């Protein structure tokens, strides 16, 4: 998310919804994979992923979940899909020819994903960064520099000429959040909006020769001109006396404003997250088995050992862990 926008509770605070061990790896890579899938119009026939030897992913992409998340994203899965640990198997079953290349690329960011995908005789390239906490930034599409965060519906148009006429036509309509001209040979017009450009709209534009559409991957979209009731606790107490209503009501009002959502939509998303948390706790307490785990499961014995006084006395921390 750009620093100029106010944070979203679901995008930046309660989340990301993910399978461990690392949000910078597994959560971000699902989102990058989903955008790459959209870019090529569906599940790719082949995919090459490149990691820089000078970055952090060359030695951790498998153990920290980058591969798992990326494969799931290329299949169009959500981050909470139970099949995630087997995403590689499903990708192979889908007939995707997958390759990972480690090379010295001198990427300026340590968490850089370079993807080259092929589908229907066409090649697509995407470069994206994992910026922490599951957040991402797409910095290049098919060789053209962009700045995208997965919080808008994006339509990418390849156009003849300098793109000025196409961009001007779109800006004159006024119902798109951002229109940017980038790249050369061909020039690309990148449209960020609350919806994709329809086929009829594209046909009415001058000199468009190719179209790609990508849906947002963040839980809460951004939009032009959004405002929120407060940005920090000091501003919050100026809007109303916090002793007169639960703090949750302030959070609810904030996220409704940030996302352009109604109360029911925000509460439904929170209930979904709560259900995932509860299911994860129950699964953890029941214990899981993985062949590559160094230590066996521990959580299923935690309560009994705590009652027997056999744990290091962590006080309330032990209760919190349980």
For the regions a language model picked out, list residue spans one by one:
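Generic N-terminal targeting/processing segments that precede catalytic cores or assembly contacts
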Residues: 2-123, 130-134, 144-145, 150-169, ...
């Amino acid at each position: 998310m750009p620093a100029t926008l106010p944070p979203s509770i679901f995008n930046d605070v309660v989340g990301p919804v993910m399978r461990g061990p690392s949000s910078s790896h597994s959560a971000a890579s699902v989102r990058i994979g989903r955008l790459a899938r959209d870019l090529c119009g569906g599940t790719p026939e082949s995919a090459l992923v490149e990691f820089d030897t000078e970055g952090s992913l060359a030695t951790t992409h498998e153990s920290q979940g980058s591969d798992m998340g990326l494969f799931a994203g290329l299949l169009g899965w959500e981050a909470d899909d139970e099949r995630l640990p087997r995403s590689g198997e499903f990708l192979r079953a889908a007939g995707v020819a997958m390759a990972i290349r480690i090379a010295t690329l001198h990427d300026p960011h340590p968490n850089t994903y370079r993807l080259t995908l092929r589908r229907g005789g066409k090649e697509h390239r995407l470069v994206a960064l994992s910026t922490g906490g599951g957040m991402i930034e797409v910095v290049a599409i098919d060789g053209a520099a962009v700045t995208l965060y997965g919080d808008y519906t994006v339509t990418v148009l390849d156009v003849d000429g300098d793109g000025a006429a196409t961009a001007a036509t779109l800006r004159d309509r006024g119902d798109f959040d951002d229109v940017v001209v980038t790249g050369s040979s061909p020039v690309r017009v990148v449209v960020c909006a609350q919806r994709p450009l329809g086929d009829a709209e594209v046909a009415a534009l001058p000199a468009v020769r190719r179209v790609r559409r990508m849906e947002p991957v963040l839980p809460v979209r951004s939009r032009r001109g959004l405002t929120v009731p407060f940005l920090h606790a000091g501003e919050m107490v100026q809007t109303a006396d916090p002793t007169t209503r639960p703090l949750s009501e302030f959070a609810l009002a904030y996220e409704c404003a940030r996302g352009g959502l109604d109360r029911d939509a925000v509460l439904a998303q929170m209930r979904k997250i709560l259900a995932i948390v509860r299911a994860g706790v129950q699964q953890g307490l029941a214990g899981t088995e993985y062949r590559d785990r160094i230590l066996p499961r521990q959580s299923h014995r935690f309560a009994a050992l705590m009652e027997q006084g056999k744990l290091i006395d962590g006080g309330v921390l032990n209760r919190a862990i349980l």
